[in-house]
């Protein structure tokens, strides 16, 4: 209503009270944030306002991984991959089986040739999502770079044991 009638200050106040209210379900906040992003993009406005809003929401320490995941996707869309790393780490802390977040973290680490970070990402990745063969693949490469040859062999054998006819190869 406030937005439709041009009362921007009241609209922002209402938006803040909704997004900062711990009693509002995460799905509702997620839908509101999607709308905020869409409006911001249509207006070609500065992304810092959206980023600031996400940061304030995350300070509430939600147990739901959807809002931090949306935030990290927003940062990627704005070509701010490095800034997304702590947010993505939070997502995999909340949900270790979140394959998309782990793959995004992996991409950043691989681009930096940070094989120690690849190991830190992929070791829990193979435990949380044993069917995701890509984590075994990158883990084997990182172990090889670290000259941990016994672990290369062990992780390749573990990957073969978890591969099925339906696995992406």
Question: Where are these predicted regions, by residue range?
Answer:
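Alpha-solenoid helical repeat scaffolds
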Residues: 1-169
């Amino acid at each position: 209503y406030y937005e439709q009638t041009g009362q921007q200050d009241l609209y922002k106040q209402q938006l803040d009270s909704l997004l900062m209210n711990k009693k509002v379900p995460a799905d509702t906040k997620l839908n509101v944030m999607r709308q905020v992003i869409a409006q911001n993009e249509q207006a070609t406005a500065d992304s810092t306002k959206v980023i600031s809003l996400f940061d304030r929401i995350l300070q509430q320490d939600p147990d739901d991984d959807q809002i931090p995941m949306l935030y990290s996707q927003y940062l990627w869309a704005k070509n701010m991959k490095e800034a997304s790393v702590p947010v993505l780490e939070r997502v995999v802390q909340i949900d270790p089986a979140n394959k998309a977040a782990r793959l995004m973290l992996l991409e950043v680490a691989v681009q930096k040739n940070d094989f120690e970070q690849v190991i830190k990402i992929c070791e829990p990745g193979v435990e949380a999502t044993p069917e995701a063969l890509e984590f075994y693949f990158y883990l084997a490469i990182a172990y090889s770079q670290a000259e941990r040859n016994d672990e290369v062999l062990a992780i390749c054998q573990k990957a073969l044991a978890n591969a099925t006819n339906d696995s992406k190869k």
